[in-house]
Amino acid sequence: MNGDEVRARASELPAEPGVYQFVARDPDGTADGERVLYVGKAVDIRDRVRSYGDPRSERIAGMVARADDVTVAVTDTETQALLLEANLVKRHQPRYNVRLKDDKSYPLVQVTSHREAPRIEVTRDPDPGAAAFGPYTDKGDVETVVKAVRSVYGLRGCSEHKYRDRERPCLDYEMGLCAAPCTGAISEREYREAVESATRFFEGETGALADPLRREMAAAAQAEAFERAANLRDRLAVVEGFHEGGGAAVAAGDADAGASTDVLGVAVEGDAATVARLHAEGGQLVERDQHRLEAPQGEDRVAAVLAAFLVQYYAERDLPERILLPEPHGDDEVAAWLDAADVAVGVPGAGREARLVELALKNAHRRAGGGDELGALADALGVRRPERIEGVDVSHAQGREVVGSNVCFVDGSAETADYRRKKLDEENDDYANMRRLVGWRAERAVDGRDDRPDPDVLLVDGGRGQLDAALDAVEAAGWDGPDAVIALAKDEEVVVTPDRTYDWGSDAPQLHVLQRVRDEAHRFAVAYHRTLRDDVTTALDGITGVGPELRARLLGRFGSVAGVRQASVKDLRDVAGVGEATAETIAKRL
């Protein structure tokens, strides 16, 4: 690549955090022999890659000259980019990356596989069979959190040698950092429960550690032990912010972290679809790629794309042990094939696995979006360039468990932090439901109760009737935020505005960005509806050993009853609180 080619390629890239790779391909132009020459991270990928158009060193100039293309993977935060860069450099060992001699990796937290009393510790080299969480970028925060876990749940941190030879409790027990399982001061069952509670924190359940710390802090303040209360307050601040930096979102990081895992995201635009695949090994994200295929026509296009991709892609490749999807693929034959191959398929509804799926979706949407879609949309609608687009959709089953979704895209990419959802009154009236949902958004904006900026475009999932209902709600609330309120009908793929209907071609870039927003609003609404529906009454109800808390944990892990049904007995056992007998019972009943 020369300087002009690099700058031209940079203009096509997102101005977002992420990782970029300079790659060289075979002389025939295929990617079969693709070699990664250099891996870098950036807060703004577009700006960083543009700088390579005028390299300042001979070494980098030589790298650019050997490169044929630049590929990227977007992330939500700079921390994610930092960790992904480290993983990719380790994976590919690019020629032009400077390697540190000691090659230290980022710290992880491991809970060992010791049968009676697992140990928790910070490590860079987890033991085989251990549950590993991370990696994390701030070792100080990790050590603070592990100390908090030990003080709350009494997990041991000693070596196996010291544990075996201990006859009486050590100093950690006296300091309140260990429950002394070595001397039987705590029963094996109670210790196991403590391990499960601690594990839930590292799986993303912040309250599992924050809540007991908060109670300890309140008790210390009540007893006027103000120095201890202050120390607990500082520790609580680290715990509450531990999962917010996004550092661990590039890791599989659950009890099955050692399994090879593929995470798929889908974006459909016109007659084509993009599938982004993220691959994790040993709990760390080490590979990502994108694939284009023809999008089937019909109602559930994303599900159809997933089913087609699973068959086409894995027919010629080794299957991973686990596959995470944004929604069920809905194909019984594909499900039977994967089940026979002992592949666990899940649709995560919450936690770190759900964030991995969101990251795959973000990469799929970014790959799908080509050219200046927002500029084309502005020209087509006669409005200013819409930097912020919000989409709304309603999901229900014959008027029951009615829910609304409100998603947000900024500069053409999903802004998941600004997603909202709303449980609506039960009524089997699509127009009335849309009026309530948009009214809720509009009234909160007018009253100042919604801290999000107003959208430039508000997109309604539906046709003329849904649009009129949305416009009624906007007018009734006196909301003048959006420059345009429009609708996108599913079947006809036509854009409806107050004045006219647009029937753009399937290759129109302005249609593609609206389709991505519409499809994401639909997915988010359906996911919430599924959660509520399963919460009201599920096939899990009445199963011996499955109470409300365990039911919620199962649904959170697998996304839905369908996800639980597809899980193997081994996958079920990996959920905290599910033993061998309960797992067998669940599998048999479902």
Curated annotation (Swiss-Prot):
One of its GO terms (molecular function) is excinuclease ABC activity. Signal peptide: none annotated. It is found in: Cytoplasm. The keyword rRNA-binding does not apply. Residues 207-242 form the UVR domain. SUPFAM superfamilies: C-terminal UvrC-binding domain of UvrB, GIY-YIG endonuclease, RuvA domain 2-like. It comes from the Archaea. Pfam families: HHH_5, UVR, UvrC_RNaseH, UvrC_RNaseH_dom. Its main location: cytoplasm. GO terms for biological process: DNA damage response; nucleotide-excision repair; SOS response. GO terms for cellular component: cytoplasm; excinuclease repair complex. Residues 15-98 form the GIY-YIG domain. Keywords: Cytoplasm, DNA damage, DNA excision, DNA repair, Excision nuclease, SOS response. The keyword Zinc does not apply. Belongs to the UvrC family. HAMAP family: UvrC (MF_00203). The UvrABC repair system catalyzes the recognition and processing of DNA lesions. UvrC both incises the 5' and 3' sides of the lesion. The N-terminal half is responsible for the 3' incision and the C-terminal half is responsible for the 5' incision. Interacts with UvrB in an incision complex. This is UvrABC system protein C.
